[in-house]
């Protein structure tokens, strides 16, 4: 099969709506021959991530947490800090990653996600 490219324009949309659309396409649920245990031949491109619609309150109050498993290893970061440190597309990557099931195909599916600022 030929690889299909699914393009999403992020301008004016919220992170959750973009991420759910991208996750659905990465899992292959937009094609007629969907099979849950087979990796789909879909590449998802998200464009204009710098124009994503987020409220100022969300930028200051949305907190992403990571825990290393060690004592004192809990790290917290706001959406504003994440955007400043890694770029606007990283919030979309995190949201899509958390919407895709954590199984053996998770990393392969995430490699098919291309985020452009």
Cite the ranges covered by each PLM segment:
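Ribosome large-subunit tunnel/peptidyl-transferase-proximal elements
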Residues: 1-94, 99-104, 109, 114-117
